[in-house]
Amino acid sequence: LALLIAVQFVTRSMGQYVTGSLVNLILIASGLMCGLWGGLAVAVLSPICAFSIGIGPAFPQVVPAVALGNAVLVLLWVLIADAKNAPIARQAIALVVAAVAKFLTLYLVIVKWLVPMVLTLNEKQTAVLSASFSFPQLITAAIGGVLAMLLVPPLRRAIKD
């Protein structure tokens, strides 16, 4: 959790694609290396912590939606590809399924429900929030998944040794 918050803080000026990809990498790695409950704890607590220190979502109503999207990502990765030596095909399936599911979760909850029905936003805020929680979420979840596929196996070996 601390690593995730530190990465968000350090990379916040680098844009959504860098920060989001690294956040998703850490979320996936947490689930695969610490187990489902450890990964879910990081997934749910990270947007709360990020919001509380001013580096997360700008609106408190968005925090639970981000936590839900993170939890979906971790849950699907762990369910599909948690085996210590999961074949690359299972990892690829996890990458696609989890990235699409996180994207759809955030898009439907934030863009299609919170923005038009719950939040009171001006036109510019609506455009920014809608853009942030649409297609870029799919890309950053996929990049985070690729990075996890590359980094989790050597991390597991390093910890085992």
Task: Kindly give the residue locations of the regions a language model identified.
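Loop-helix junctions at membrane interfaces
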Residues: 1-161
